[in-house]
Every structure is written in C-alpha cells, then in structure tokens.
UniProtKB/Swiss-Prot annotation:
Endonuclease that specifically degrades the RNA of RNA-DNA hybrids. A divalent metal cation binds at D94, E95, D197. It comes from Limosilactobacillus fermentum (strain NBRC 3956 / LMG 18251). This is Ribonuclease HIII. It holds the Pfam family DUF3378. PANTHER family: RIBONUCLEASE, RIBONUCLEASE H2 SUBUNIT A. GO terms for cellular component: cytoplasm; ribonuclease H2 complex.
C-alpha cells in the first residue's frame, strides 16, 4: 500500500528528525527510512511524505490530526495486474519511432527497484509523449545514472534490412525481447515482474519470438498505456525518446538538413530534397512507409 500526505514545515522537520537514517537518499528526498512493515520517504520541495508497505496507513496516521483530510492512496492496479503492482520492483520496456518516417526504431528497458518508485515519480517521470525535449533530456540522464538501462537504436539501414524478413510488429517484439534479456543479465536481483507496453496480444507476441535463442517469458505482463501502470515503463519511454533524439541529431547532421518527426506532408518535402541531393533514403528513413513514393513523385517535379 502507498499513502501520501502533505505536511507543514514544522511537522516535516519533526519527521525528518524522527526518520533520519544512514545511507543514500533517493533523488529529491530529505529523509528515507525503512522500518518494520513500512518505508517512509519525505521530499524536500513538496513536503510530501510517502509511506509504503503493510503498515503505511498506521504510520501515516501518527502525523495526521484527527480532523485532517484522509491521505491519498495509490491508484488501484489496472485490470490484469496484481494489486499493488505500481510499487513493485519492475523491469519495463517501451519503444518510440514506430510512426515516424525518419530516424530509428528505438527500444529501451529500465529496471526500477521498489525503493526507487517514489523518487522517480517525484522527479516527474511520466509518459514521454507529455514531456518537452528538455524535460526528456534531463530526466533520461537522471534515470540512466540511477537505474539499470538497455536501449537499442535500430537505425534506418538496419531497420529496412530486417523489414524484408519481418513485419513491424514482429520487429518490435524482437527488439523488446532483446533489451529485456540484456538488462536481466546485468541484474543481481531479479525483478518481481516485467511489464511490456502492449502493442499486440500476449499470444501473438510470443509467437513472434519463436525460434529465438533467448526468450524472456517469466513473470511478464502486458499493458496498454503501460507508463500509467508502472514508472518503469514511463522511464523506458523517456530513455527511448532521448536516444531517438540523439540519433535524429546525428542523421540530420549527415543529411545536412533537420529531419522532422512524424509522417506528414512536411516529411515528404524533406525526403524529396534528400533525393534531389542524391542521398539514399535507406540511410535516413523507414522506406516501406508511403512517404517514400510521395517523395519520389515530388522529386521528379
């Protein structure tokens, strides 16, 4: 169970004295203590205090006056996930670049231990689509400095070669399996669960992996909008987007022009310019997209 309360400055300082303990503090925390049945973490800027564990409610009640509003509880786990899943130690994976013509297909996996969940949430780790590029860069660097991370940038030439053999969903499955397996190899303590941001059914996902030498299949859960189910998937989406941004900068430099995100008409115009410059779209873009034919038509005009 998670309980979060807001306290005034005198109470916060009193709690800081009560729960002060040796050891490294989570990012943004003023104090962090593991007691029997409960872990307590207080955050400096917000004066929010999180209680995690079976005795969270009882411990939080010590600091709440009788007429205070009820402390906020963590949201229930989404359907299909165990109760309390959001507080587990989880290895999460997500990908970006699927719908973008230029750039790589980037997949990342991030392991978040149970005692890191609160600090990453407090930092603002959330769905990467809701964050600005500067926020992505800041958060990704913090995630990569504190959590085990694996990412795979499947650059356009490599992506296009594999698309001759696989469909895009199968290629995504292979990439997720790869980054999950590589991260698991580095973990001294195995996660309580693995959460994949769902893009196909569980059955189809594992069918796509048949014949692979290593298949991650134990304690695996699938969830659409996985970043809302656990911060590990949100962290993975941020790392993936960060690495994708870096790759796009490199490709733009090679192309001599800023390559746009997405697959709209602006993309067609830039792709046509690359063709006119004599550059090979295979090195910059996912050429199976309809944008390729549109760009070729524009380049002939």
């Amino acid at each position: 169970m998670n309980i979060v309360i807001n306290v005034d400055t005198p109470t916060f300082e009193q709690m800081k004295s009560t729960y002060q303990a040796p050891g490294t503090l989570p990012a943004g925390a003023a104090f962090h203590a593991k007691l029997k049945g409960v872990t307590v973490t207080g955050y400096t800027k917000s004066h929010k205090v999180m209680f995690q564990g079976a005795l969270a409610n009882q411990e939080a009640a010590r600091w709440q006056p009788n007429d205070a509003p009820a402390p906020s509880r963590s949201t229930p786990a989404p359907a299909g996930l165990p109760a309390g899943f959001a507080t587990w130690s989880v290895l999460g994976s997500d990908e970006v670049g699927v719908g973008s013509y230029f750039g790589p297909l980037t997949t990342a996996a991030v392991f978040v231990a149970a005692d890191q969940v609160a600090s990453l949430t407090q930092l603002g780790v959330a769905d990467s689509k809701k964050l600005t590029d500067p926020e992505i860069i800041r958060l990704a660097k913090q995630i990569m400095a504190t959590c085990p991370v694996t990412y795979l940038n499947l650059m356009p030439a490599a992506y296009n070669a594999r698309m001759k053999k696989y469909n895009q969903a199968q290629l995504k499955a292979l990439c997720h399996n790869y980054v999950l397996a590589k991260t698991l190899e580095r973990l001294a303590t195995k996660p309580q669960a693995i959460l994949i941001d769902q893009f196909v059914s569980e059955r189809t996902y594992f069918n796509y992996l048949q014949g692979q030498p290593q298949i991650v299949s134990h304690h695996v859960y699938f969830q659409t909008k996985g970043e809302q189910a656990h911060v590990a998937v949100a962290a993975a989406s941020i790392v993936a987007r960060y690495q994708s941004l870096k790759a796009m900068d490199t490709l733009s430099e090679q192309a001599g022009i800023t390559l746009p995100i997405g697959a709209g008409h602006a993309v067609d115009l830039i792709a046509a310019k690359l063709i006119r410059k004599g550059l090979d779209l295979n090195q910059f873009a996912k050429v199976h997209f309809a944008n390729t034919q549109k760009a070729r038509q524009l380049a002939r005009q």
